[in-house]
Amino acid sequence: MLCWMPALGQISGKTYFGFDRNEYPGDNLVPALHRSFSYAGYWLNNPPESNSNGWTGKRAILKANGFGFMILFNGRLDTQLTGKDAAALGRSDAADAISAAKREGFAPGAILFLDQEEGGRLLPEQSAYLFAWVEAIRASQYKPGVYCSGILVPDGSSTISTARDILSHEGKRPLALWVANDACPPAPGCVLPKEPLAPASSGVRDALVWQFAQSPRRPFAHRCAATYAADNNCYAPGTSHSPQSFLDLNVSSSADPSGGR
């Protein structure tokens, strides 16, 4: 059984719930989703393992229904970087992200998040790619952000998360982080709690967004498995359980984390 909090995703303490998923849910489902969520993930290019992007051209309908945005560009996996000029690919992909953001109508100053799918400490080629992308966005009319894991993993005699690795490189330079940490705890599972849920609980103090539940449920979330549906996915309230309606859950101190309205 899923436990949900009604009404627009806003709870006390000025935090807001949002959703993301790889496939666009369909125009008909957008109003129902806004009853629970204030913002949506918005892909600028093909999402992971997809050959097309159903989000293209959907900014207007989402905005008309009151949604803010988390603007996302699908980055490259390590296998796509090994043996190549990773920094050059980062700059080229940043240029593609900038062009796509302009085409979709996102104004200057919006945050573009790079989707860094693989967790742990960045390998040299991953680091070269990611930071070249970040610097190219930083030099444009947009602001850089990264979607990455906040889950600690073994790193020699210590532990590391992708988020901490990135922050140690960036120092005090501004970089928005959308942190994925669905481990229970700190994540509550597939619920929208009545109590304020702080992005800092992701394990990254200055996280702009915390993704705290994913579909399908991962082993990290086994302690809160009962909060997910029987098929191990997470669904929005008031929607049927279907391939069009499972999603990931996020919380932020902003109702428009990317400033995309």
Over which residues does each language-model region extend?
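N-terminal signal peptide c-region/cleavage motif recognized by signal peptidases
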Residues: 4-6
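Functionally critical loop-and-helix segments that line ligand-binding/catalytic clefts
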Residues: 10-23, 30, 163, 167-261
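Substrate-binding cleft of extracellular glycoside hydrolase catalytic domains
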Residues: 11-140
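Flexible, glycine-rich phosphate/dinucleotide-binding loops
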Residues: 49, 78, 153, 216-218
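Acidic carboxylate-rich catalytic motifs and surrounding loops in phosphoryl-/glycosyl-chemistry enzymes
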Residues: 74, 148-152, 214
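Distinct, well-ordered alpha-helical segments
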Residues: 124-126, 155-166
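Aromatic-lined carbohydrate-recognition surfaces of secreted/lumenal glycan-active proteins
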Residues: 140-157, 209
